[in-house]
Each structure stands twice: as C-alpha cells, then as structure tokens.
UniProtKB/Swiss-Prot annotation:
This is Uncharacterized protein MAL13P1.304. Residues 169-182 have a biased composition (Polar residues). One of its GO terms (cellular component) is nucleus. Residues 550-559, 838-847, 943-954, 1205-1215, 1660-1686, 1704-1717 have a biased composition (Basic residues). It comes from Plasmodium falciparum (isolate 3D7). Residues 1-28, 741-776, 874-924, 1045-1057, 1261-1289 have a biased composition (Low complexity). It comes from the Eukaryota. Residues 1-34, 162-187, 440-461, 544-568, 736-777, 837-979, 1044-1071, 1084-1106, 1160-1215, 1257-1290, 1651-1686, 1704-1731, 1742-1761 are annotated as: Disordered. Residues 856-873, 955-966, 1060-1071, 1088-1106, 1166-1192 have a biased composition (Basic and acidic residues).
C-alpha cells in the first residue's frame, strides 16, 4: 500500500496501480505516518509542505480523534481496474520530524498542505470515478490561519467552495469572488493547479480546470475555468483513471469537506447560479444532459459571505446556500447541491450489502446522468444493490457512449429530489429540517393534507418502472416537509420520527450534510414567494428553521463523543429510519451523497452516524413509506442498542474449512482476514500516536475480535471499514501477485502476528514481544513485495521468521523469569488474591453499569458462542507435527470439525480437540445456525443454561462468560463474526497459546480475557482480568519451557533430540482433567516426577469419563480451572504462610477425622526420622520458633504419610495418639489467644519465601488419588495442600479451611512480603525453582537481621500499611542486596537509588554495550534450562538473538519513555506549571486546551506556616532556657514557668485557626513562596527535577499501563535489569549550575534583572543594614553583651534568607507605639511586590497594622522591606521568560 511514490513521477499511465502499490519503502509520502497513497493517488496528488511550520504544528486545537478520510473506490467490475490504493485521503503528519515534501509527478501541482495533526482531510482523493473529472483536493493551509478546503466539482453545476478558517480569520472577502480573481494573484503559498486533463487521454472531457489557485487564506479561481471549460458529458467513453488524470491533473471536488480543528466551518457562501432554460425539465434530472451541461453558465452574481461557523459540536448555524436559479422553474430550489455536487462517491452506500436502497446511488446515478464526470464509483457501488448496482456500475463504466450514463437502464435515475440527499446522517449537526414537536402535533387535517400532497408528488415524479432508482424518500408520516411547485414538488423529507429525542436534536437525519439541508431550507424559503406554496407551508418551514436554531443553541454544550448515546436514542426511537436508507456508509468516505462531501465533514467521524438499522430495499421496489418504516422499525428494534456501524451488514464472513482460512465477502470481493489484520497492523504501526488510546486494549481484540476492533475504530473516527477492507484487499492482491505457493500459510500467520503486534504497538509497544519484532522487522514484514517467508523456507531465505523471533523473544523473557531467583511467588499470589477479590466486586458493579441492553447482549452472546464454533480457523496447515502442535493448536481450538484437528497428528491434540468439540457442542449447540439477530428464544435458552450451571458451583464458566459478554458490549454481533484464530498475535500465540493443547475452555477463557476491556469506560473487569491472567500464566509457563521446542526456535538453533522426546512423551501422557495441565510444569520435572506430581492418572487412563467430565464442566470450565490452578495454590500457600498449620490441621481433623488422624499422629511421631529431609526441602525458619517448627514438620508428614505405609509408624501412632491431640489443642489455644496482626505479619515474613510454598504451587492440578499411590518424596508436600483444596472449592478465604478468625482473613489480603521482588509483576504465577541452598541462606540471613534489628520489622509494617512506593522500592532494593540491610532505611540509600540516573542512560543508550549483558543473560537462561529441565541447549545464532532483543528493548523503552518522564515525581509539577499558571500566557502552547490543572498547595502552606510558628516557639523556649541578665531590676517580672509559655502558645495556635490573622500574618507571603517552591521542586531538590532514574523506570514498569500492555516476564526481566543500572549523576559543572539557576529563576517568575541588580548591591546594603541593626540592638540591650552581639551577627548573615523570628515582647520592655511615617507607602509597596505565584492570597503587608499591639522596633519596617526585596521568592518574572523556562523544563536532557 505504500508506494514508491517518488518513482511515480515518470509514470503517467498507471493503469495497473496494483503494480505500484506494494513497493513499500519508508520513503513513503507519509514517512511511515498516515495512510499510504496508491500510486494512482500519488500521481493525482502532488502535495508539498511549503510551510516550514507544518511540522511544528503540534496537536494544538485538534480533537483527539481525527477522521481519516478514506475513500475506497476500487472496483474490479467494468473498466475499473484500479484496485490498489486509492486509500489515502488523509494523513496525519504527527511527527514533528516528518515534513513531507511530496511531488511525485512533474512538480506541476503543489499542494501546500500543512498537516493539522489529526484533522486534515485530504479530500476524497480516491478518484476511482471513471468519471474522470473529480479529484477532491483539500488544501488545508497550515497552522491556525485558514483551512481552505476547496472541493470544486468539475461539474459546472456545483461549485461549492467552502472556506474553513480555523482561527476565525476572515475567509474570502465578499466583494472579491474567488472565481473572479486572476491567476496573477497567486501567492507563493498558493497551490496552482495548472494541469489540464489530457484531451487525448480524457475522452470524456476536454479540460476541467485550466487554472486553479488555492491560496492560503483565500481561494482564487478563474471563472473561465469553470464555466467554459467543463464539457463533462460530451465524451463517449470514460477511460480508466490513469488516462483520465494524466499528469496528475488536479480536479477539485465540488463540495469541500470541511474539517477544521475547531470544527469551525465557515462558508458555504450563498451564491446564485443562473441556469439556462433547458434545465427546468426535471429538477436535477437533466435528460439532455450532454447538451445542457455544455450550455450551463455558472454566474456567480453574489457571494454572500455568510461564513457560518459550526460549533465544536458541529452545529451549523446558517450555512449559506447556493441559490440556483433555473429559468422557467419556480422550484429552482430543488436543484441543490445534490445535483451539482457530483463528486460524490457512491461508495458508502454499498457498505451495507443488504442496503438495496441506494439513496446515494440514486443521487450518484442522477449525477451520472447529467454530470457524468463527477460520479465516484466505488467498490461499494456494486454492493448497494448487488445486482442492480453492479449493472449500474457496468453501465456507467462501459456504456459511456450514451449521453445518459444509464439512460436506458432500469437503474438510471433522473430524479434529483432533495430527498435523495437525505441519505447521510450527520450527527452533531442539526438539520434544519428537524420537525419540531409542535408541528408534529398539528391537526390531523393538515397532516393528511400534507401527506396527500406529498404522495401525489411522489406519484407524479416517480415512474416506478422506468426509474427504479428514483427513490424519492417516502417520508415518515410526521416528517414530511415538501414544497409544492406548479410542476413539481421538491421533496425535503426528514425521515425522523416524532420520537426524535432532544439528544438527537442536532443531527440531521436527512442523509445530507446539514449545510445542504439548511441550504435546501433556504432555497425553499426563497421559493415560498411563489404562489404555489401556501402560507401554511411557509409557516411550517419557518417553524422548522426556528426550531433548528433553538436546538442548535441547546446543543452547543454537547461534545462530539455523544454519538453512541445518539445512535442508541435514534435506534430506540426509530428516529433514523430513512426511507431510502442509504445510511450505512463510511463516515469518512463521504462518498455516498454529494451532500456529505458537499458541505460539511466534521473532523470527527461522529458526524456521520452509522446505522446498522438501515433496511435494505431494492431500488426496483419503491415501497410506500409505511412499508419501509415497518421494516426499518423491525430492524432497528432488533439492533436496538447496538452501536450500529455501517459495515455490520455489509460483509459476510466465510470460512474455508479445507484451507482453514476465513474470508470476508465485501463488495463482491473476498478478502482474507489475515490481510485485514495485516493492514490494520501496518496502519497502527505507521500512526502510533493516532491510535494511542487504543493501545492498552488492542491485544484483547486480536485474534477473534476483528469486528470489535473495526467498530471501535469507526466509533472513534480512527479508521473506516471501507477503507480497511479496500486497503486489505489491495494488500492481498499485491501479495497474491508476489507470493510463492509455499509461502501462503506461514505468511498469513506471520502477518497476523504482525498485525497484532502493530495493533499493540500503536503507541507503547503493545504486546511486548510482538511489537518489538514488528518494529524491528517492519521492512521485512510489511514492506517487501513478499511478506515474510515461510517457516519451511527459513533456512534457504536466511530470513528470520517473525513468529520465530517472537518465540525467541518471549521464550527468553520467560526463561529469564524462571531465572530470576528473586521470589515472585508470594507477592504475585497475594496480589492476585487481592485483585481477584477486589475484581469480583468491580466486575459486579460493571455488570450493572454497562449498557446492558438486552438485544445487545443477546447478540453478543450469540455471536460469541457462534464464533467460538464457526469462526476460529486454523490458518496454518503446516504438516510439521511440532509446528502444528505448538503453533497451531489454538488455531484449531474451536473448530467443531474433528477433521481440522486431525491435521495435527498428535494424540494429545486429538484428545483435546475432541474434548473441545464436545464442549463446544454442549455449550453452543443452540446457537449453531442462528444469525446475528437477538431472538428472545435464544435469550431464554441462554438463561436456562446459565441457571443450570450456576447451581453447580459458585463460580462457573457460564457466570464468567455472561459477565464477560456483558462486559464485552462493545463487541456487537457483527464484530464477533470476524473472530479469527488464524491470526494469532505473536505474543499471544507464542506465549499463551502455541503449546497449549486445543482446549476450548482455554480458548474461551482467552477470548474472555479479550473481552475484559470495556472500551467505553476504559476500564478492566478486574475479576475476569485476574482470573484469566492466572491461566494465561499457566500457558506462559508452559510456553517458557516449550520455548525449547522445535517450532519455537529458529532452525538455526540446534535443539537436542532429548528435549523433543521428553516433550512428546509428556504430551502423550498429559491430559489434565480439564485439558489445562501445563506443559510447563511437566517439562520442569523428570518423567517420573511429572508422572507422580502432575497427572491425575484416572483422568489420563479413563477416557470413558471424558464425556462425563465435559458435561459437568462445560459451563464451568473457565472457573473450574481457575479453582484448580489458583485457589489450590493460594490456599496451600496460605496454609503454610499465614495460619499456623495446627489450625488448618485441626480443621481437617474435624472434617476428615478418619483419614487424617492416622496421618497426623504418624507424621509428628516420625518427625525425627524425616527431619533432615523436611528441613532441606521446606524449612527456612529460624530457631526461634522451634515448637511451631516442630508442629509444622509433623504436619507436612502427617498429611502426607500414607496409612499402612510403614507398620512401625502405625504402632507409634497408636501409642502416641492421645498425647498428640492434647499437644495440638494446647498449641492451638495458645496461638489463638495471642495471635495479633503483628504476629501474622511476622509469621508471613518468616515463612514468606519457604520453598514449601513454591512446591505447593506445583501441585495445583493434582488430586489426592494421584499421590496416594506414589512413593515419591515430593508428594509429601502435596497431599496436605490437595486435601485442603478438595475441601474448599469455594472462597479462598473461607474459614472452613483455616480456623483463623475473620479479622485475620481480612488482613491476609493486605499482606505484602518484602522478600519478593516487590516490583515484579504481581500477575505472574510463582515459578518452580529447584531447591537452592543459597536462597535458604539468604532467607536465614534476613531472618537473623530481622531479629537483630527490630527497626526492620517496624519499617516493614509501616511500609506495607502505607504501601508507599518509595519505601517499597528502597526495601526491595535493600532486601535483594543483602549487604544493604544494615543501612536499611537511611536516607542515604534512598538518595543513592535516585542517583541512578536513567535519563543519562537513555541519552547515552549505546546498544552495543548491552550486548554483553544480554549474552550473559542468555547464558544464564541456558543454565537455568539445564538445571530445571535437565536439557542442554545450544544456541548458534546468539548475535542474531541479541540484536532482536536489543531492538525490541530499544523500541519499547523509547515508547515507554514519555511515561517514564511523566512518572518522575518532580516532573509532574512542571506539567502543572505548564498547564496551570502558564496556560494563559501569550506564547503558551496550551492556551486553547481544555486541560485544567489545579495544584492544591494549601496543605503545604499550612505546613510551612505551622513550621514557622513552631520555629518561633522553639526559639522562644530556647531563649527562656537561658535567662538573660537584665539591665534593671523590675518588680513587674513574671514567672517564666507559669503564665507566659501557655499564653504564648495559645496565641500562636489560635493564629492558625484564624486564617493567619495576627502576628504571623505578615509572613504568609513567605510561607506561600516556600510552599510554592516546595511544590515546584519536591524537597527543594532542584537538581533532581531534570533527572529520570531507574527508579522512575521501575515505577512505570509496575504501572497499570505496563501491566496491561507488557508481558509479566518482560517487565520482570526489566526490573532485574534496572537493578544493574547504576548510572551516577553527571557531576554538576558551573555551567550546568548556572543554567539551572537561570531556568529556575524564570520558572519561579523571578525577574532576572532585578535579581542581578540586587545581588550586585547586596553586599553594600548589608553593611549599612548591619550597622543600623547593631546600633538598634545596642540601644535595646544596653551595655556590653558580647554573647548577645554574636548571636545577632549570626542572624544578620541569614537575614535575607530566613524567616525573621520575632521574639515576644517582654512586658517590661516599654516601647512607645508611634505611627510609622512610611506605613502606607510600605503597605502599597509590599502589596505590589508580593503577589504570589498561584494567587492563593494576594495580601498587602499588614504587619504595620499589628505593630501597635506589641510595640514597635525602630526601623523595623525597613528591615522587612529589605527581606521582601531581596528574597528570591518574591521577585517577579516576565511572562516570556516564564514561558521559556516552562518549556525548558520539558526537556529531560537539560542537564545530562
């Protein structure tokens, strides 16, 4: 799709645009951003960015989502071969760095197109019209000035020039009409279209525009160009576009698509066009179209500059209208832009295959009849009426000889009724035609009368036989507005129902652009003077217009994203039932109606409401309004609350079971789903910023929810369905040309993976591994004519297969996870527990709050069930068993046909597939043959089923499915039709699914995880999220070890046969109860061990029980698996960790007395025998807990020892049984009595990392039966857990499991364990690691240190109650490195942490230096494999892997970098300053943003105020502690201890509550400035403001965003990596310090000049003041007091920096109060100088007001003024410097 555009300059005849389409080069016109142009389009559009500022145009005023105008006009039928890429109508140049100068063809045309980030519409440049003449060129002039979008239709009939000015600058002046300006006026910026249509090549027309100049702020055209030179209909033949547009002649499309950032659409000017007499025949139906058109003179008599602006809500107030004057015809009015805006693409209509009414087609056809050149034939044309339209296309294309394109055909329409315009819904724009309620309520007579008139008109104007396409909208009963002419009625039918709710008020339900509708109204108003129209009608129209105005006023507040609610309202109220509904169209391809193109295209797709509800009526059948309405109402009821996007009904999903592929039938084309994903991937990869909002969710769409994804893209105006399909089709065509027969399967697969990667890549590299690979391999994957080579050809081509790369990457991540001995176990499980319990609550709430509209859910459920069965197809038919086994199991998962599954010759696969199929049948059989309609019957069946299953267990799959389906409301029926397993995102495929046996439950679960995200809310159903993650982690774990398997390692790897044999053996034996045994676990052990530990032999041997199992669990598979994997593990852990095992033992004695009494006693009695073994394997506790330890040891044995295993044990048991029970009861009582939270925490700490926990996790899927027969020692650990788990399938924290009381259980949820890697991903399951003595030693040392330093425990309690990330990080850092334990919480360590300056690392990121690190890591991985799996692996192409990993890391890191920057706690404040106080500055980039940031520093002010008071108090007390010698003895002296301190304290404390009134009031400014500074730079660490450290990186890794987006393994690996990052800060040079000070001064709004002058004069002033100050105190103090003087001197030195602490007056110090002469002046002066930065308090210095209370110091006011003037906090800054400083702080490299 990306063309080698630069090569197209020379090729004038691009008949086969396909040839050029796939020369994918990064030189692409868009520089990798935006939608690629087809070769053809590149020829057509020569766009050069003349404006230097273009790339600086950061998305300032631009709405978040920009509508790409994607118009696909590719049709295979007829002469229309241009299948390839007319795709690019819009491109976002989002990178500042990309300035695209693009002039592929002979520099003839240069569009100065400045890219507003998201809003630029590059007109509909898909000129697939064989109608040669129209290319929509939207010239958007840059920056804020004017967006002049001139779409001038070649058709003489309409030249609508819309001038859009973004920043409200004046558009074209009214006196100078743009067409009358001459070419001499061209400016440098202007676009000169001097191209001629080559007359040789353009058979149809001579030259359309000779000279056209689009200027930045005005449009200049030569009138002659339009009037004289448009001979559109003369030519007998329309050749293909390449001939037509030879030399890139730019035909400017008629109606401008108006998009401006602010959605200010200014100007459909009112222009009067006078037409010759010939045109009056049929309004818009020009039967003699050739001749007439030649004679048409376009005279613009007036250009009324009614630039009517559209609000951001796209309410059009008054858009000027074309008054077209047709002589002899009073109803000139009816020829509105419809007739003349011939450019419109028939495109959108067809989007709905069912849409047989072609309102748009009619319009198009009409235009075709009289304006041949402008009709854009789209692919979709064929689809509108699969039969009729196709004929139309053929006729249009082939039968060009006829004067009328489809003159003799049924389909030809001569009808230019305005009703035909009404096909496009433009949401957000209020149609003036909306019928006010009062009109609706009119008397029956009037209404009937109107209806009769209307019906008559329809009869007269429609010849049903001849003009089948002449569908005149038969209006709804209540909404007929039509005007009567002597001869004809121009129909303006507003097909709204009475029910039009006020939500919908803004939306023109006529499918015409609102401007058109308003124009029509204006036209009608003009024609009202004709006597044919009576007063009532004029009043009616007037009412309509008034109502429109009112509604527009109301709707101003509405924001664009209300489309959903609007759509829902429309559907509920059946408001949007257009009779000739061609509503289902692409928002961006405003092809269907000229109208859409004509006047307004709102930069948000939201303007166009996509209605699935459109009933498709054949053109031939023109039914009465009632029939259509009925059908529509039915349909709308079916789809009631679904977000109806047009594409829903427009394609069919076809499954090719033989080839295991899935196809989409669209516009009579079959598109393989793979290519759809490929295209989406490419699009996302090229426009990451654009799709940023989607990033967290993409991977949840990936294999099965293509439809959901497209719908979401539609909904948020990011991509259009037609565009996607069209592009995908082109891609597929290109690929088919180049492909080799053996490449197909792998390419599809790889591409699918790539797609997903790219999806996730969008902004933050999505699924870690996937995105990395795609990014690194973009060229290979997407840009070569041949997509990635097949696996089988890997060796010969020496290409790295993308899947393999992903496997390598993910595999290494997983192994690294295994490798990191830092224990994630407890942490992860605790977090999971916490999240799951929380998540359940959240999930329930969400269930209620979601838009659970019944039909919607029905459809979702049906579609999801149905899709489980039908649509999941294996796209990879590699015969290689390993490949199938590993890569394709999941692809096959949900096929019900065993044939597909049998392709995989592995027994394991067959078994699992059978299970899956049975499950699917059982679960979904009632949905097999149903369509996407939500029948109540199905709903009832579903309810019945769910009820049944709910009875069986508390948590069942059906519950979850239901919840998930409800959560997945965004996935409507149609979405789920596209569910494909064939494309598996590489990460998911490799990490989650590849090696998992085909398991419907797993698949279902995985799908459910995709549905976890509610895009509307942007939230996750945490319940489902966590549950699914657990099992995904099983899959990941399996993947970790399977990474060694053949399919996952490139052929260049040599993998020893031992490994695969081991795997296959295990596979044969392995079939877990619910098909979810993890190969990972199996591979971790020897065959013996794995047999003993991991297999339920009954399940393996008794396949007879399979059906029974399936029937029992088919509804509950998801949750049951969860119970087995997660609950057992966590319960087992908690039994070891949190409750003294005696309690759980006691409970079990109660529950299973017979079995366990024997076991317990025998275990304890034989404790000594087993002690050694027990200690080695399990106990890391210290000697302090001996008694408990003994009980624990006994307990492990007691549970696991088998009765009758050793006779000696039985004998001992009988002897000692009584004693044992007594002992147990005693210890239990003791423990219960004294247990506290501290004890719980202590126990958790002490037992936290014991390998008991890790090993108990291994036993997740085991049952008692399994272990009874095994003598393996490992079972000693397991039975304990398993028995417990069997008893408790319910709540994890149920008291039946451990007797600990409820408080404890609540507390359990909160516990965190510092031994774990606290920052590692909490979702990851514990990793099974062989016993490691080093770990035991480490734990013991920690325990010793804990005992030694009580501070440690205290801090842990404190830290984890607070969950302060800083403390946790410090704790984590220190615990992982035992040497740091002694200085555990010293500030120095925190400082050291922060000194690891990651920003420095980023700047000097030399990836070569990382090579050694990665290689070392790989070596460790291999050792780990050897230790755990007993396999030796050799890697031959290490360098290749290193490069892959490096690229992956680099791209990820750079994607995460903005997050990391933002996470910097100092950096957050600078965003406040940028968005807060600097926002109103002249130069601010954020002036127009709606973001408001409020920094609440009131608490800081209070704090500093209190601190200053405390300082005073302390100072006072100090002075009291050293009594002073007094000059004279006084009887007035008061006792120090009695009154004074208390009084003083009271006064000080009261000041606080009185809003600082009192002595302290004068210091508010100082306090405030301190608070400000503190807020600006936390803890005054100015230097750190610009530093980003590994600490920030770690915080980001642990953020929700990364949790959703990156795999746990990768994040964990990164956290390990971070531990090794010790980049010390760059030392500060004088230059850096100086620079920083300058920036800081500007930032804090200090005036640099004043500060400089102050610093110059400072020393002199100080000397003066010092003298005065000393003298002052000498007077006070009297005779020599040397000590006192020294003290004063110290104070003086700091006088300008510190708060001056006023000591309280002594009563005996009498100072006469006298008024200061300068008091008033000082007040004013200080008041002006002390306005504070955040304007919390602007106070004058009232200090003097309070002087009289306590006397005065001589000259004190001057001292205060000195402080104020010299205090850096008080100084002022100029706004310019402030703004500059703010921007500088955005630069992370400031000091590195």
């Amino acid at each position: 799709m990306n063309n080698n555009n630069n090569n197209n300059n020379n090729s004038n005849n691009n008949n086969n645009s396909n040839n050029n389409n796939n020369g994918n080069s990064n030189n692409n016109f868009f520089s990798g951003k935006g939608n690629a142009l087809s070769a053809y389009q590149n020829k057509i559009l020569n766009i050069k960015s003349n404006n230097n500022n273009a790339h600086h145009f950061v998305n300032k005023n631009v709405p978040t989502y920009s509508p790409p105008n994607i118009i696909m006009a590719n049709k295979k039928g007829g002469n229309f071969n241009n299948t390839s890429g007319n795709i690019i109508n819009r491109y976002n140049v989002e990178n500042n760095n990309h300035r695209n100068t693009y002039h592929p063809s002979n520099n003839n045309t240069r569009n100065s197109v400045n890219f507003l980030n998201k809003n630029i519409l590059y007109g509909n440049n898909n000129n697939n019209n064989n109608n040669n003449n129209n290319i929509n060129i939207t010239n958007i002039s840059n920056n804020n000035n004017n967006i002049n979008i001139t779409n001038i239709s070649n058709n003489n009939n309409n030249i609508n020039i819309t001038n859009i000015s973004n920043n409200n600058k004046q558009p074209i002046s009214s006196n100078q009409h743009p067409y009358q300006q001459k070419q001499s006026h061209h400016h440098n910026n202007s676009i000169n279209y001097n191209e001629y249509m080559d007359e040789k090549n353009m058979n149809t027309s001579q030259s359309i525009f000779k000279n056209m100049t689009i200027q930045r702020n005005s449009q200049q055209f030569n009138t002659s160009d339009f009037v004289n030179n448009i001979n559109i209909m003369n030519a007998p033949h329309i050749n293909e576009h390449s001939n037509i547009y030879k030399r890139n002649s730019l035909n400017i499309v008629n109606n401008a698509h108006i998009i401006s950032n602010n959605m200010n659409i200014q100007s459909n000017r009112n222009s009067n066009i006078s037409f010759p007499q010939n045109m009056n025949a049929n309004i818009g139906g020009l039967k003699n179209s050739n001749h007439n058109l030649n004679n048409i003179e376009m005279k613009y008599n007036t250009l009324n500059n009614n630039m009517n602006s559209i609000n951001k809500n796209t309410n059009i107030t008054n858009v000027g209208t074309l008054n077209i004057q047709m002589k002899n015809n009073p109803m000139n009015v009816n020829i509105n832009q419809n007739n003349y805006n011939t450019d419109f693409y028939v495109n959108e209509n067809k989007v709905n295959s069912k849409n047989k009414e072609n309102n748009n087609n009619h319009i198009n056809i009409e235009k075709m009849n009289y304006i041949k050149s402008n009709v854009y034939l789209d692919n979709t044309l064929v689809q509108v009426n699969s039969n009729n339209n196709y004929n139309m296309d053929k006729n249009i294309l082939n039968n060009n000889n006829n004067t009328y394109i489809i003159n003799d055909k049924k389909n030809s329409t001569v009808n230019n009724n305005i009703t035909n315009m009404d096909n496009n819904l433009v949401p957000g724009v209020m149609s003036s035609m909306n019928i006010p309620d009062d009109i609706k309520k009119r008397k029956k007579k009037e209404r009937k009368k109107n209806e009769n008139i209307y019906n008559n008109r329809n009869k007269s104007s429609i010849n049903t036989e001849e003009h089948n396409n002449n569908i005149i909208d038969v209006a709804n009963q209540n909404s007929e507005h039509f005007l009567q002419n002597n001869k004809q009625y121009g129909n303006i039918t507003n097909i709204q129902n009475n029910n039009l709710s006020h939500d919908m008020n803004n939306y023109s339900i006529n499918n015409s652009t609102t401007s058109d509708v308003i124009g029509i109204v204006e036209l009608y108003k003009n024609s009202l003077s004709s006597k044919a129209v009576n007063k009532k009608k004029s009043k009616l129209i007037k009412d309509v217009i008034d109502d429109n105005k009112k509604r527009n006023k109301k709707e101003k507040k509405k924001t664009i994203p209300n489309n959903d609610s609007i759509i829902n309202d429309m559907n509920k109220n059946k408001n949007v039932e257009l009779l000739n509904e061609t509503q289902i169209f692409d928002n961006k391809n405003y092809d269907k109606n000229n109208d859409i193109h004509n006047n307004i295209y709102n930069s948000n797709d939201n303007n166009l409401i996509h209605n699935k509800n459109n009933v498709n009526n054949d053109h031939t059948n023109i039914k009465e309004a009632n029939n259509n309405n009925n059908r529509k109402s039915e349909h709308s009821e079916k789809n009631k609350d679904v977000h109806n996007y047009y594409y829903a009904n427009n394609y069919q999903c076809i499954t090719d079971e033989k080839n295991n592929k899935q196809y989409i039938l669209w516009n009579n084309r079959t598109i393989e789903v793979t290519f759809v994903w490929l295209f989406i991937t490419k699009e996302f990869n090229e426009n990451r910023k654009k799709y940023t909002a989607f990033l967290p969710y993409l991977k949840h769409f990936y294999p099965n929810r293509l439809k959901d994804l497209i719908e979401q893209l539609e909904k948020y105006s990011l991509l259009k369905f037609n565009y996607i399909m069209h592009s995908s089709y082109n891609m597929q065509e290109e690929y088919n040309k180049n492909k080799e027969p053996n490449n197909i399967n792998s390419n599809d697969n790889n591409n699918k993976n790539d797609d997903n990667n790219n999806n996730n890549n969008k902004n933050v590299d999505g699924n870690n591994n996937n995105n990395n690979n795609i990014n690194s391999n973009d060229k290979e994957v997407l840009m070569n004519g041949m997509l990635l080579s097949d696996k089988s050809t890997l060796n010969s081509n020496k290409q790295i297969d993308n899947t393999l790369i992903n496997n390598i990457n993910s595999g290494f991540n997983n192994i690294i996870k295994n490798m990191s001995i830092d224990d994630n176990t407890i942490r992860s499980i605790m977090d999971n527990i916490e999240n799951i319990t929380k998540g359940k609550k959240k999930g329930r709430k969400k269930k209620q709050t979601l838009e659970n509209n019944g039909d919607n859910i029905k459809e979702d459920i049906k579609s999801s069930k149905k899709d489980k069965k039908k649509d999941n197809i294996n796209d990879n038919n590699n015969d290689n068993n390993n490949d199938n086994n590993n890569d394709n199991n999941n692809d096959n998962n949900n096929d019900n046909n065993n044939d597909n599954n049998n392709d995989n010759n592995n027994n394991n696969n067959n078994n699992n597939n059978n299970n899956n199929n049975n499950n699917n049948n059982n679960h979904n059989n009632h949905n097999d043959n149903k369509n996407n309609q939500g029948d109540s019957k199905n709903e009832q069946e579903k309810k019945k089923k769910t009820r049944q299953y709910r009875k069986k267990s508390k948590i069942t799959n059906d519950d979850n499915n239901e919840k998930i389906k409800q959560d997945n409301i965004n996935s409507n029926n149609p979405k789920n039709d596209l569910k494909n397993n064939e494309i598996i995102c590489s990460e998911e495929k490799n990490m989650k699914e590849d090696n998992i046996p085909d398991d419907t439950h797993y698949k279902e679960k995985r799908r459910n995880t995709f549905n976890l995200f509610n895009l509307d809310e942007g939230t996750i159903n945490m319940d489902l999220f966590n549950l699914s993650l657990l099992e995904n982690d099983d899959a990941l774990n399996k993947k970790e070890n399977d990474m060694v398997s053949k399919s996952n390692i490139p052929s260049s790897f040599s993998s020893p046969p031992k490994e695969t044999n081991n795997k296959n053996d295990i596979d044969k034996e392995q079939s877990d109860k619910h098909n979810n045994v993890q190969e990972f676990q199996n591979l971790n052990m020897n065959n013996e061990k794995s047999k003993d530990l991991y297999f339920n032999k009954n399940d393996i041997d008794n396949n007879d029980n399979k059906d029974k199992i399936i029937n029992e669990t088919s509804s509950g598979t998801f949750m049951q698996n969860l119970k087995e994997t997660f609950y057992e593990k966590t319960k087992a852990m908690f039994s070891n960790l949190l409750s003294d095992t005696k309690i759980s033992k006691d409970d079990e004695l109660n529950n299973e007395v017979d079995q366990n009494c024997v076991k317990t006693s025998s275990g304890i009695l034989n404790k000594e025998e087993n002690n050694k073994k027990e200690d080695d394997e399990k106990h890391f506790d210290d000697n302090t807990n001996e008694q408990k330890k003994n009980v624990d040891n006994g307990e492990y044995n007691e549970m696991t020892a088998e009765p009758g295993r050793k006779k000696r044990k039985k004998d001992v048991l009988e002897r000692k049984k009584k004693n044992l029970n007594k002992e147990i009861i005693k210890s239990e009582k003791r423990i219960r009595k004294y247990r506290t939270k501290k004890m719980l925490l202590k126990e958790a700490m002490e037992k936290g990392i014991s390998n008991n926990i890790v090993e108990s996790n291994i036993t997740a899927n085991n049952n008692n039966d399994n272990n009874k027969n095994n003598d393996n020692d490992n079972n000693n650990n397991n039975n304990d857990n398993i028995i417990n788990n069997n008893n408790n399938n319910g709540d994890m924290f149920s008291n039946s499991y451990d007797n600990s009381y409820i408080k404890e259980n609540k507390y359990n949820k909160k516990l965190c364990f510092p031994q774990n890697n606290l920052l590692s991903d909490f979702r990851s399951e514990p990793i099974i690691i062989q016993q490691d003595k080093r770990k035991i030693i480490k734990i013991n040392t920690i325990n010793k240190i804990k005992r030694k330093y009580k501070k440690f425990r205290f801090c842990i309690n404190k830290v984890f109650k607070k969950k302060s990330i800083n403390d946790i990080i410090a704790l984590n850092e220190n615990i992982h490195k035992n040497k740091d334990l002694l200085t555990l919480f010293k500030k120095k360590d925190l400082a050291n942490l922060k000194k690891k300056n990651l920003s420095f690392f980023m700047d000097t990121l030399k990836l070569e230096k990382i090579d050694m690190l990665i290689m070392k890591r790989i070596q460790m991985c291999l050792e780990k494999i050897k230790n755990t799996l007993l396999l030796t692996c050799t890697i031959n192409n290490v360098q290749e892997i290193v490069n892959i990993l490096k690229k992956a890391f680099e791209k990820r890191l750079y994607l995460m970098w903005p997050l990391i920057e933002f996470s910097n706690k100092y950096r957050l404040d600078q965003y406040f300053h940028l968005l807060g106080k600097n926002k109103n500055h002249i130069n601010s980039s954020f002036k127009d943003t709606k973001l408001f940031v409020h920094q609440n520093i009131s608490s800081l002010i209070l704090y500093f105020n209190q601190r200053s008071m405390d300082d005073k108090w302390v100072e006072y007390l100090k002075s009291q502690m050293k009594p002073k010698r007094r000059r004279r003895k006084t009887k007035m002296k008061e006792q120090f201890l009695e009154d004074k301190p208390i009084d003083y304290l009271n006064t000080m404390n009261s000041q606080h509550s009185n809003n600082f009134i009192g002595e302290n009031f004068s210091e508010i400014e100082t306090v405030e400035s301190k608070a400000n500074e503190y807020a600006f730079v936390g803890y005054n660490q100015k230097r750190l403001l610009t530093q980003i450290t590994p600490y920030d990186y770690r915080v980001v890794l642990n953020s929700n965003f990364c949790n959703k987006f990156f795999t746990p393994n990768w994040r964990e690996q990164q956290s390990i990596f971070i531990d090794n990052l010790h980049f010390d800060m760059v030392p500060d040079t004088d230059e850096i310090k100086k620079h920083f000070e300058n920036v800081y001064i500007r930032y804090m709004e200090y005036d640099e000049e004043k500060l400089r002058s102050k610093s110059d004069t400072k020393s002199k002033e100080h000397k003066k003041k010092d003298k005065k100050y000393k003298m002052l105190f000498k007077k006070k103090e009297g005779k020599g007091k040397p000590g006192r003087k020294k003290k004063i001197k110290l104070e003086i030195e700091n006088v300008s920096n510190e708060i001056k602490i006023k000591k309280p007056r002594k009563k005996y110090e009498r100072v006469k109060p006298r008024k200061s002469k300068n008091a008033m002046m000082n007040e004013e002066k200080s008041g002006n100088s002390e306005k504070q930065i955040n304007n919390v308090l602007n106070v004058t210095n009232i200090e003097n007001k309070h002087k009289s209370k306590k006397g005065r110091k001589p000259k004190e006011s001057n001292l205060n003024n000195l402080n104020i003037n010299e205090d850096i906090n008080v100084a002022k800054a100029s706004p310019d410097t402030l703004h500059r400083a703010s921007l500088e702080f955005m630069n992370p490299n400031l000091f590195t």
